Amino acid sequence: MAKAVYVAEEVRVPEGVEVSIDGLKVTVKGPKGELTRDFSHARNIVIRLDEDEEGKKVVVEAYFANRRVKALVGTIAAHIENMITGVTKGFRYKLKIVYSHFPVTVKVQGDKVVIENFLGEKAPRIAKIMPGVTVKVQKDDVIVEGIDIEAVGQTAANIEQATKVKDKDRRVFIDGIYIYEKGVAE
């Protein structure tokens, strides 16, 4: 398979966002906070900060890249884009509390979500909240917000997984907490 001589992806840096690059460690500061990510596992890749007439941009590039390195360039550029979106707007996941017979009670206690009376169970089910994420319960909705897309997504997945029904017909036992909307918080 032929190697590409030069592969590059550009990510624009908007006003009010500060990006610093130390080798393969990228730090993004914005109005909502600061995110740092280490890409040192990505060999043969260069991350640098450039400036042109349109403003600042982060360039992720590689020379003589095979298919794996090409994919890695795009992945790292997407991660940096998500970091910039996170510190400017943030991310929000919305989950719906669904129950048919036993009324489910959902409470936030410190760094965990406690789900009580799920399918009439005596013991509460517990889902972990990742660091830097806020969880709010409003009637039948659970709102998960934060600046790190991976932490927000993992927290929402933890809540959804905690209410998984095993050994029963999913068409009959529809109880659970389900993700129904995800996106940018604004």
Curated annotation (Swiss-Prot):
Gene Ontology CC: cytosolic large ribosomal subunit
Keyword RNA-binding: yes
InterPro entries: Ribosomal_uL6-like, Ribosomal_uL6-like_a/b-dom_sf, Ribosomal_uL6_a/b-dom, Ribosomal_uL6_arc, Ribosomal_uL6_CS2
Keyword annotations: Ribonucleoprotein, Ribosomal protein, RNA-binding, rRNA-binding
Gene Ontology biological process: cytoplasmic translation
UniProt keyword rRNA-binding present: yes
GO molecular function, one term: structural constituent of ribosome
Signal peptide: none
Quaternary structure and interacting proteins, as annotated: Part of the 50S ribosomal subunit.
Family: Belongs to the universal ribosomal protein uL6 family.
Known function: This protein binds to the 23S rRNA, and is important in its secondary structure. It is located near the subunit interface in the base of the L7/L12 stalk, and near the tRNA binding site of the peptidyltransferase center.
Protein name: Large ribosomal subunit protein uL6
Taxonomic lineage: Archaea, Thermoproteota, Thermoprotei, Desulfurococcales, Pyrodictiaceae
